[in-house]
Amino acid sequence: MLQSTLAGEPCQNKHDRKSGAHPSSSFYIGRGPSIERSTTSTVRKREAIIFGATGAVGSELLRLCLDGSRYSRVTVIARRPTSMTHEKLQWVPAEFNALEDLATISGLVDGDAYCCLGTTIKAAGSEEAFRRVDYHYVLNAARFAKQSGVTQFSLVTAIGANRDSGILYNRTKGEIEAAIIAMDFPSLNIFRPSLLKGKRAEFRLKEEIGNWLFLLMTPLFHFGLQRYKPVEISKLARALYVSADPEHKTISPRIFESEEIQAY
């Protein structure tokens, strides 16, 4: 059954067959646009759901959603609460392998869902555990969002996402992209950042090494390697938030490559 706590803290085209995988029957440039637009009493405020709000990207995105005027309510679905408190914040404790237990709030969301779930093989402990989070849990989140009436879904994957890749990480990211594209959300944004740069609750050695290597390679970014430059976590969160503004919509699905995210 649904349990919610207000003010707790806790979260390329559709025909591009190379961008991701087939749906599974299993259940988981310059400066960017201005971050907020004025609202009037005639504009109905939207609602938001965030999956993964306790992670580095999700927590930064949550702050933007709460501080901005776009949303009247922000629902975080997570196993544990975040450290933030706000009158618009609603925390719904849940396990991502059992989101069907939350079916009681279906149809109550008039707005957007953001999915910032993700891990690494090392952090997950095995390839199977990694895939459970990055594919099945993400797919569960998207299904739940769809059933809840969400009209716009924003998904974070990674640079190099490709369902035909021989690398498990890239292949899994590509497969989940394709599965969610097939769900046919009215509006879908997919973000493919390079390595993420910023403060994390957990230490990721490979990302830290990668960030140092890219720092040494900075001069090469002017020679075609810009897309591999590490992305600030704050920029990714801003890109997620700004792109969800209805006034900024263009095509769907819209894929934001890493160099585009750098512009925010």
Predicted regions: what is each one?
Residues 51, 77, 116-117, 153-159, ...:
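SDR active-site strand-loop-helix element
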Residues 68, 124-128, 132-177, 182, ...:
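Conserved Rossmann-fold NAD(P)-dependent oxidoreductase catalytic core, especially the SDR/UDP-sugar
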Residues 88-89, 188:
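Short, conserved active-site loop motifs that form the nucleotide-linked donor/cofactor pocket
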Residues 47-68:
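N-terminal Rossmann NAD(P)H-binding glycine-rich loop of SDR-like oxidoreductase domains
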Residues 48-49, 73, 89-140, 144-147:
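NAD(P)H-binding glycine-rich loop region in Rossmannoid oxidoreductase-like domains
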Residues 11-15:
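Short, charge-rich patches within N-terminal targeting peptides
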Residues 67, 163-264:
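Oxidoreductase cofactor-interface core, primarily capturing Rossmann-like NAD(P)-dependent enzymes
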